[in-house]
């Protein structure tokens, strides 16, 4: 939090990579939940 002098482009790049890593993980979790819930029927 002390590094407020970070360029916006760099922080946007890091945020973009964070989203890139998080999106597949969230999608996989959602797919697993749907599969497990549908297999209980």
From Swiss-Prot:
Cross-link (Thiazole-4-carboxylic acid (Thr-Cys)): 30-31
Keywords annotated in UniProt: Antibiotic, Antimicrobial, Bacteriocin, Cell wall, Methylation, Secreted, Thioether bond
GO cellular component terms attached to this protein's record: extracellular region
Propeptide: 1-27
GO terms classed as biological process: defense response to bacterium; killing of cells of another organism
Gene: pznA
PTM statement from Swiss-Prot or TrEMBL: Maturation of thiazole and oxazole containing antibiotics involves the enzymatic condensation of a Cys, Ser or Thr with the alpha-carbonyl of the preceding amino acid to form a thioether or ether bond, then dehydration to form a double bond with the alpha-amino nitrogen. Thiazoline or oxazoline ring are dehydrogenated to form thiazole or oxazole rings.
Species annotation: Bacillus pumilus (strain ATCC 7061 / DSM 27 / CCUG 26015 / JCM 2508 / NBRC 12092 / NCIMB 9369 / NCTC 10337 / NRRL NRS-272 / CCM 2144)
Crosslink feature (Thiazole-4-carboxylic acid (Arg-Cys)) location: 28-29
Official protein name in the record: Plantazolicin
Cross-link 5-methyloxazoline-4-carboxylic acid (Ser-Thr) mapped to chain: 39-40
């Amino acid at each position: 939090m002390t590094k407020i002098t970070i360029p916006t482009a760099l922080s946007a790049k890091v945020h973009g990579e964070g989203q890139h890593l998080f999106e597949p993980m969230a999608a996989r979790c959602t797919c697993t939940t749907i599969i497990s819930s549908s297999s209980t029927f």
